[in-house]
């Protein structure tokens, strides 16, 4: 967990805290747990750095788009870190093709850019299975989505955080010492 925070810090520039947040973390349960001591997170990290955590457990990217105006644009942060898609792949709200997941990520990116908010895109974290949806085989869809996200970020000159590569086993699972359920670090 500390390595993930260190990676984020390395990407963000240092500035004095002020009224608007420096960064908004927009995502699902991966981010949701980062500022909760209940889940091993570090709420003081967010407070000390003027970051706002808008991770919502179980959400798909369409739900992230629906709240993007309120949670990101209205706060007018310097940047937004977007990490989502695993719940789409898990079919939490039904089947969602990868092209639609990517469309939602592009929509959030465009909304942020229209308001001069810097966008940092993240890969989907590795998972060999979803405990709540054992019939889903997520490895190939996650790898496919991560290629799409990386291509989009590179083509549009966006900052990009690859969580997948350092956290994945060669079989596409989240490394065991990092997780109790194989999905959440």
Functional labels for PLM-detected ranges:
Residues 4-13:
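Sec-dependent N-terminal signal peptides
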Residues 11, 30, 58, 126, ...:
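Residue-level detector of flexible, active-site-proximal loop/helix-junction positions
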Residues 15-19:
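Sec/Tat signal peptide C-region and signal peptidase I cleavage site
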Residues 21-36, 56-60:
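Catalytic nucleophile-elbow at a beta strand-turn-alpha helix junction centered on a G-D-S/GDSL motif
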Residues 24-26, 52, 80:
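Conserved beta-strand elements of the Class I
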Residues 26, 54, 161-163:
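Hydrophobic residues at beta-strand termini and immediately following loops
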Residues 41-50, 63-185:
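Alpha-helical cap/lid subdomain in secreted, periplasmic
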